[in-house]
Each structure stands twice: as structure tokens, then as C-alpha cells.
Amino acid sequence: MLYFLSELTAQVSALNVFRYLTFRTGGAVMTAMLVAFVFGPGIIEWLKRKQGEGQPIRSDGPESHLTKKGTPTMGGIMILLGVGVATLLWADLSKGYVWAVLLLTLGYGAIGFADDYLKLTKRNTKGLSGRLKLVAQVGMAVIAGLWIMLLGQGDQASSLALPFFKDLTFNLGWFYLPFAAFVMVGASNAVNLTDGLDGLAIVPVMIAAGVFMLIAYLVGNIIFSNYLQIQHVPGTGELAVFCGAIVGAAVGFLWFNAPPAMVFMGDTGSLALGGALGAVSVVTKHEIVLAIVGGLFVLETVSVIVQVASFKLTGKRVFRMAPLHHHFEKKGWAEPTVVIRFWIIAMILAIVGLSTLKLR
């Protein structure tokens, strides 16, 4: 919104600063952070009044989790508020990619909100049926994927690039649409599975959003994209503002989610943030890089798949409990130890992911 003030540069030269993507990205970071800081306490108090006993705690989980009883959930509301306000305020809203990604994020947030609401009202950990949730996620992802493809240019809209290789792309044609939907739905559920300990998911999300903030800027800049020999996608630079908003909102939320958490993001936040990362990776043509940068989310998801498959096929469990973070808790690791070590893994994977921009 503020971008359009740059059109008045002829009258007020100082307004030219709103043309600069880096300035607006920084503004989005600070705005989203301030929104979370300012409105966070009020949102938490409101959630406490509405939820009473807070998020239901799994009876078969680690015993240390029983102390979390009464902690409100749906804290993702403050994240979405921060991201939404900051994006609308600082991004160039004439770019279709901004709307496609933002609306998908809010749509996934709505699915998560419904899931959290049912968990609270039914007083169990199930929420929406898995089938209904998946259908809603896939439906929204297909719409967003089609929108993104229509905004693209020629064959590039349906191409898949491989990291570490120069100019190696595959044109998937219309098969790219189900692939893009898979990326968005998969990323959404992967972050959701990771969100099981205080601060565990939000920091890796923040790290991944920071990486894609840079990627969006580079992909949207023809000079940098040519230098790095990565695909140039016009208009994607504005997603740096969106990713900056996620970083800022995540910092603000972490203030309240740091152990011991005052609030959980719930599916409201985790489904939305995962979907956002997936959508940005699709737009910037760095879907496989997301699997590297978000490798922690992949590990958590694979641990669940392996656990379920092993139990159904052999009757035995590979892990003491899935997702993976619960396995280490069951082995005796303290919750802060698990969280911080997983943060370190996320940082290492982010560095590896960034290296794909240059190592070709």
C-alpha cells in the first residue's frame, strides 16, 4: 500500500524511498514484529477467557507435557495478523504473486482455526477429520497453484529446476500443478507435525522465511539471477516483503512462545506458515531447495511415515514415539535440549540450502 506513495516522488522527493524493496522489506519485518508485540498480550488474554482449559494434551505423550495443561492455543492468530497487516502495508499490491501467496496463507490459517476450534470444543486432540482437512488443503493448493502458473511466463511457469546444476530444468507441463499442490500441502503438514514443543517450529520457520526472503529478492532481480544462473521470475521480489513479514511476526510470537510457552500457535499458525513457505518456493522455482532448507520439517514428517508404516507392516515401532522430537524426549532429553539442538540442525540446513545459489 505504501509503495504507491512513491508515485508522488515528483511532489515529495523523500517518498522515493518507498520504491526500494529492501526498505519495504525491513519495514515489513518491523511492522509485523510490532503488531505481535502490541496485540499479543491482548490476544493471549482473550484466548484464555474463551478456551478455559486450553489445548488438550495427549495422554500418551511425555509426562513433562502434562504441565502445559491450560496453555491457550490458536496463537497463530497474532502471527497471521502481523503478516497480513505488514504485507498489505508494505508490498506492491499490484503483483498477483503477493495475493496468491497471502490468500493461500490465510486460507490455510482458516483450516487450522477450524481444526483448533473443534479440538477445544470436543476436548480431544483430533479436531477436523484428516480427510476433510486434506481435501480443503488440496483444493486451496490447486487454486493457488493454477493462479501462480497463469501469472508465469511461458514454459517457465511449469518448469522444475534442480539445485547444484546450471540451467537444468524440466518442463512438467500441466503435471506441474499437482506437484505444486503437493509442495504446498506437504510443507503445511510438515510444519504442523514439527509444532510439538515450545518454540520448536517457529524458529525453523523464521530461518526458512529468512532464506526465502533472500531467494525471492534474488529471483526477482534480473541482474542477480543472471549472475547466479538461477531462474528470473519477474514480480517475485515482492515476496521478500511477505517473507520479511513472516520473520517479524515469528520473532514477535517467539516472545510469548519461548519456554515455558504462554501460548501455542496451534494449527492456525502451523498450517498457515507451512503453506506460506511452500507457496513461496513454488513461485520462486526453488521447491527442492525448500526441502533442504526445511529439512528439519522433512525429517519430522518422515519419522511419522516410517513409524506408521513399520507398525502396520511388522507390528513394531522404529521410534519410541513420533514425530521425531518426541522420540528424543522419551529417551530422556530435556525439552529445551531437543528444541535448541533442532534449531541448530535448522540453521545448518539453511546454510546448505543457501549454498545451492552459488554452487553450480
Curated annotation (Swiss-Prot):
Its EC number is 2.7.8.13. One of its GO terms (biological process) is cell division. It catalyses: UDP-N-acetyl-alpha-D-muramoyl-L-alanyl-gamma-D-glutamyl-meso-2,6-diaminopimeloyl-D-alanyl-D-alanine + di-trans,octa-cis-undecaprenyl phosphate = di-trans,octa-cis-undecaprenyl diphospho-N-acetyl-alpha-D-muramoyl-L-alanyl-D-glutamyl-meso-2,6-diaminopimeloyl-D-alanyl-D-alanine + UMP. Pfam families: Glycos_transf_4, MraY_sig1. It is found in: Cell inner membrane. It is a multi-pass membrane protein. It comes from the Bacteria. Pathway: Cell wall biogenesis; peptidoglycan biosynthesis. It is an enzyme of class 2 (transferase). Signal peptide: none annotated. Its cofactor is Mg(2+). GO terms for cellular component: plasma membrane. Catalyzes the initial step of the lipid cycle reactions in the biosynthesis of the cell wall peptidoglycan: transfers peptidoglycan precursor phospho-MurNAc-pentapeptide from UDP-MurNAc-pentapeptide onto the lipid carrier undecaprenyl phosphate, yielding undecaprenyl-pyrophosphoryl-MurNAc-pentapeptide, known as lipid I. This is Phospho-N-acetylmuramoyl-pentapeptide-transferase. It comes from Rhodospirillum rubrum (strain ATCC 11170 / ATH 1.1.1 / DSM 467 / LMG 4362 / NCIMB 8255 / S1).
